[in-house]
């Protein structure tokens, strides 16, 4: 489903200036107390800004698709119409997930530490909230997988630069002005014709008792009036033809400059079985990790290994497909698999790997050595603080 074209002036203004939200989110990130006392408040503001950005990107994608454009200015593909609605819900959940985790954590911290029953209860509530969020995202992605007939999920956002939207909206406004400027000429011609007819009718009424010569002249005037009317209607017909020709030329030019959007999902891929298995493993990997994390605990290696094995199996099934058919990856699939490879770096800062090899290991000793150099001391302190903060929240390192 493609979103409708905007009509509100406020919405058009926001769409044409949506990139400025990035500056607002950067300011929120560096607010005083962002990772301290004001963490929950600032994360709430950040979530609201993300939701607004997601909505504007959703509407911007609809504008591009409705104008038969499927690429933004940097060459990235816009998700097809059957992606948009479900993908919008996924991005909305992702915008709120960290806020809900912080809210559950802050509620737990307000209780007395000596009350172990309350602590366990609040900890269970936090675990349940994270599980529900991960399961909800998995269900939405599974729905998207069904919509794509088992093809790889290659779209995870629908960001559109505001300059692209502004260009399209300005072109549409200019086209409307061109059509409107054609209409006054036809209207003026018709009004002139009506004035001529009214004047001639008055002359006929004033000369009812004239002689036969005047009567013949009036007949000639009637013939002239009919001829003038025919000329005006002919002029109107020519103007309409010019408008239709101009509109057709603009549509042909627009189609030549863009790619015709496919409104229907593609057929199932030839390597349907292996690719679908790979995508299902990719979709449910976060759920598998979190459930095992809740069962075995933070210090156990089982959740870490189970998640990593699931990730590698997913990559193998999705990347290699059916060897016998020798199916080659598309450009979008290759980019998506490369993106998933980069997400493997999150395993370096997850427990218990981080505590074992980084937090108290070689990297920590190396950073402490660099801190002795005065130039690097401040930068190293900031890096370590951010690393410690990012490890305190599950969704910072979940890569889901």
Swiss-Prot record:
Residues 190-224 have a biased composition (Low complexity). GO terms for biological process: peroxisome organization. Pfam families: Pex16 (PF08610). Signal peptide: none annotated. It is found in: Cytoplasm. Keywords: Cytoplasm, Peroxisome biogenesis. GO terms for cellular component: peroxisomal membrane; peroxisome. The keyword Flavoprotein does not apply. Residues 176-226 are annotated as: Disordered. Belongs to the peroxin-16 family. Required for peroxisome membrane biogenesis. This is Peroxisome biogenesis factor 16. It comes from Dictyostelium discoideum.
